[in-house]
């Protein structure tokens, strides 16, 4: 009887351990997948503010260029390319989270007009798939299919990103019309300077939080510094913590002012935003334009033929 109870207890403990492990795994996977694509998804319902500013600029403080190329006009229910270019010097290295140097990553957000969305895989041509590579796009929100995000991905491979876009059809979507629409894009290269919670990353400059004399500098075992600033007027000491990454600019015994830079600025990346316009073209309007041009050409041909016929008649009358 006791042996039976022991086996029953062991069985329950095994089941409980498996259940706990499975829950931890699911939670960890969920948090990683939710946090990975772009920090802005966690804190902003819409990536573009009412002022037109894209919220990525709140964390990526340096201003850098970005370029977008789209067709001038597209027909309804058509797949086209939106090419986003995020240029930077491929030779530079950025400060990683552990303080070491590494290659830059890139990311982009593409804000399309309502109705435009990511093209389904079966509508993408082999040539376009080759340009896209192994990139995986996703919607900014499940209910915002017109806003697409990508990254962070390797800047060495994907400084030029091709988005496959499907245009809407006003015949099936009554909220869409044949008009000219704006497209907005934001692109960053490198890590940000501020995290979404407002704290600094190690990819930015650190300033003195007090004025005084640098009385002590302690280099931490895992990198970074503890800088003690002493104020002789009130015998107060302030300790500033510098994470691994930025290079120190001050030394012991040096007098410093409030907000004076203690480190260099290691940031080599930045964020930029741009826009473009695209026309959703009515195919009947295109057909009408072609018909009009054909009519003009035919009229010109008939006019030339008529003129030559008139000249022949005049010439025959003169000979007569």
Swiss-Prot record:
The chain crosses the membrane at residues 286-306. GO terms for biological process: photosynthesis. It comes from Eucalyptus globulus subsp. globulus. Binds 1 heme group covalently. Heme binds at residues 36, 56, 59-60. One of its GO terms (cellular component) is chloroplast thylakoid membrane. It is found in: Plastid, Chloroplast thylakoid membrane. Its main location: plastid. Component of the cytochrome b6-f complex, which mediates electron transfer between photosystem II (PSII) and photosystem I (PSI), cyclic electron flow around PSI, and state transitions. Keywords: Chloroplast, Electron transport, Heme, Iron, Membrane, Metal-binding, Photosynthesis, Plastid, Signal, Thylakoid, Transmembrane, Transmembrane helix, Transport. GO terms for molecular function: electron transfer activity; heme binding; iron ion binding. It is a single-pass membrane protein. Its cofactor is heme. Gene3D superfamilies: 2.40.50.100, Cytochrome f large domain, Single helix bin. It holds the Pfam family Apocytochr_F_C. The 4 large subunits of the cytochrome b6-f complex are cytochrome b6, subunit IV (17 kDa polypeptide, petD), cytochrome f and the Rieske protein, while the 4 small subunits are PetG, PetL, PetM and PetN. The complex functions as a dimer. This is Cytochrome f.
């Amino acid at each position: 009887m006791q042996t039976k109870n022991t086996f029953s207890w062991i069985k329950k403990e095994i089941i409980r351990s498996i259940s706990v492990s499975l829950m931890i795994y699911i939670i960890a996977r969920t948090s990683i997948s939710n946090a990975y694509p772009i920090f802005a998804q966690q804190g902003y319902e819409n990536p573009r503010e009412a002022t037109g500013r894209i919220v990525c600029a709140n964390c990526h403080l340096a201003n850098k260029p970005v370029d977008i190329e789209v067709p001038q006009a597209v027909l309804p229910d058509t797949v086209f390319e939106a090419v986003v270019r995020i240029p930077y010097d491929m030779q530079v290295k950025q400060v990683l989270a552990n303080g070491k140097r590494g290659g830059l990553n890139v990311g982009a957000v593409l804000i399309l007009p309502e109705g435009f969305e990511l093209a389904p895989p079966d509508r993408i041509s082999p040539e376009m798939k080759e340009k896209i590579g192994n990139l995986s796009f996703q919607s900014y929100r499940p209910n915002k299919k017109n806003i697409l995000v990508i990254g962070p991905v390797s800047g060495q491979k994907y400084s030029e990103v091709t988005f496959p876009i499907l245009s809407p059809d006003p015949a099936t979507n009554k909220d869409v019309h044949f008009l000219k629409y704006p497209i907005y894009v934001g692109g960053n290269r490198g890590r940000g300077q501020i995290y979404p919670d407002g704290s600094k990353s190690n990819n930015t400059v650190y300033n003195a939080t007090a004025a005084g004399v640098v009385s002590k500098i302690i280099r931490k075992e895992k990198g970074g510094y503890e800088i003690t600033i002493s104020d002789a007027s009130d015998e107060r000491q302030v300790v500033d913590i510098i994470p691994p990454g930025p290079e120190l600019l001050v030394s012991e015994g040096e007098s410093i002012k409030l907000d004076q830079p203690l480190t260099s600025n290691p940031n080599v990346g930045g964020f930029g935003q741009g826009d473009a316009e695209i026309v959703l073209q009515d195919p009947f309007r295109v057909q009408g334009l072609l018909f009009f041009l054909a009519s003009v050409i035919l009229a010109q041909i008939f006019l030339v033929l008529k003129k030559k016929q008139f000249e022949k008649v005049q010439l025959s009358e003169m000979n007569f």
